[in-house]
Amino acid sequence: MDSDFGIPRELSPLQQLRSQYKPELPPCLQGTTVRVELGDGTTVAEAADSHTMARAFPHTLGQPLAHFLRETAQVPDAHIITELPSVRVGIVFCGRQAPGGHNVIWGLFEALKVHNAKSTLLGFLGGSEGLFAQKTLEITDDILQTYKNQGGYDLLGRTKDQIKTTEQVNAALKACTDLKLDGLVIIGGVISNTDAAHLAEFFAAAKCSTKVVGVPVTTNGDLKNQFVEANVGFDTICKVNSQLISNACTDALSAEKYYYFIRLMGRKHSHVALECTLQSHPNMVILGEEVAASKLTIFDIAKQICDAVQARAVEDKNHGVILIPEGLIVSIPEVYALLKEIHGLLRQGVSADKISTQLSPWSSALFEFLPPFIKKQLLLHPESDDSAQLSQIETEKLLAYLVETEMNKRLKEGTYKGKKFNAICHFFGYQARGSLPSKFDCDYAYVLGHICYHILAAGLNGYMATVTNLKSPVNKWKCGATPITAMMTVKHWSQDASYTLTSIGRPAIHPAMVDLKGKAYDLLRQNAQKFLMEDLYRNPGPLQYDGPGADAKAVSLCVEDQDYMGRIKKLQEYLDQVRTIVKPGCSQDVLKAALSVMASVTDVLTTISSNGGQ
């Protein structure tokens, strides 16, 4: 019911305490002046996509990075915006809820009112459907009171549908025009921010004055690139999951007779599973990216687990905890091929009960082998973005079933001499994504909300609010905005076996995989054998808001060497210094030295670029 949105919440004592917490702002966002420096124009993420991207985004491709600066910054090219008229801004939750989302609204609202008290913030009720239907709620400080630093998306509600069809895009344009919006802020993950980029281009082509801004909010942690270090919600969901996992570890160690198979929400890629492993130290984690890279079959994975169970039994350890990302199932080559066939037949209108008779021989053989509960789940209709309904596919139960079958066989044959194998299965996701947000997510979301205002005040369209150097304290965060087109790529795939016919996908932000050459994965690999055999279980405990642990951040964030925006800014400063020193009239020695150094730098950068930046 629309009337339920925005009503005051009943708050527990802890929630009341959290609602009084005021997140800190970095120095560049403090005060009442907007100072923005626009850098060089951005390039496409993949050179091969240049032509397709140029055709898709003639108005918004190649826009510059924006850096927001503190009021006292001595930057001659910075644009200082002092005239800040009242504006009307719409904001909408798209995609699944993530802890901290409400603080984006709070941060934007505060920035609007600080710079001009007459500005208006309208929340669209029920996500994108509310946008199309122009169902709005005017955000006020009274309405926000019981939603500050709180979880969920229940202030406005949400949808997970895309803004993609011609009808939907036109409805969004009409809503923004009818409501006289100066800006539209879209909160979501890779799909929602892809839609934001296309919407910004459509608005620009239609000469609509509404500027579109995206905000990286998703528990999956897969909206990652050089510009985006973390997503709002990821920190919280990993900390909550890690406590639950650690509790299971303690239980397993106490009873010494159960293996816990725990599947973690996180869509196709394994960022949540990797981070939770680094925080809680379970015995095993099966990352989808490892499986895909090694082309492991479902039977290979089951054998890996069985061998681990047998090795632990030799050490008189008949218990353990195994983490499984929900996207593992689509990383297994033969299962992925089966799902593609099933989805193709469903799109053709074939009923679920007749699909098994129309599968190819290989897929049919696999399908018939699978237990009935998995068959039923694989036959579910795909999501709106054509992906499988991963949260509904109980991969943990499938693996537990296969492992139990094999261990019983080994027990009978005498090759396994441990206790009878007992599995307990769990799926963690819904329990965590509605949690109170962590201190980090509260701060990060609030800052992103403020940045959204600065983007709109600077008149920028098709940008994402970004913060880098996140592993440092808030006062060292670098705030800016990146054209969403700079994060987008185009998928190409073959339509036939000869590879002569290829299809080109819609330009999109594609989910980032776990980097198997990254420092977070390397940390896992260094410790994997110890985690497997030594029961080094670690319990981080519940979310902390004060004292030890309150300022802890994701391990995968802290081990990486990032701050791309800060380094781009530093490079720009060096180049400016070079231009100041080396100009007509400088000495021959200065000119020769500059040429020599620049030639060497160019050679090194050309070599690195040709190797794909590795």
UniProtKB/Swiss-Prot annotation:
What tissues express this gene product?
Answer: Expressed in leaves, roots, and flowers (e.g. sepals, petals, stamen and gynoecium).
Function as written in the Swiss-Prot or TrEMBL entry: Regulatory subunit of pyrophosphate--fructose 6-phosphate 1-phosphotransferase.
One matching Pfam family, short form? PFK
Q: Which UniProt keywords apply?
A: Allosteric enzyme, Cytoplasm, Glycolysis, Kinase, Magnesium, Metal-binding, Transferase
Please tell me whether the keyword Transferase is annotated for this protein: yes
This protein's GO cellular component annotations are: cytoplasm; nucleus
Q: Which Gene Ontology BP terms does the record give? A: photosynthesis; response to fructose; response to glucose; response to sucrose
The beginning of the lineage is:
Eukaryota, Viridiplantae, Streptophyta, Embryophyta, Tracheophyta
Instruction: Give compartment(s).
Output: Cytoplasm
Q: What induces it?
A: By sucrose, glucose, and fructose.
- Assign the protein's first listed, main location to one coarse class: cytoplasm
Q: Quaternary structure?
A: Tetramer of two alpha (regulatory) and two beta (catalytic) chains.
Organism of origin: Arabidopsis thaliana (Mouse-ear cress)
Q: What is this protein called?
A: Pyrophosphate--fructose 6-phosphate 1-phosphotransferase subunit alpha 1
Q: Which InterPro entries does its entry note?
A: PfpB_PPi_PFK, Phosphofructokinase_dom, PKF_sf
* Pathway of action: Carbohydrate degradation; glycolysis; D-glyceraldehyde 3-phosphate and glycerone phosphate from D-glucose: step 3/4
Q: Its gene?
A: PFP-ALPHA1
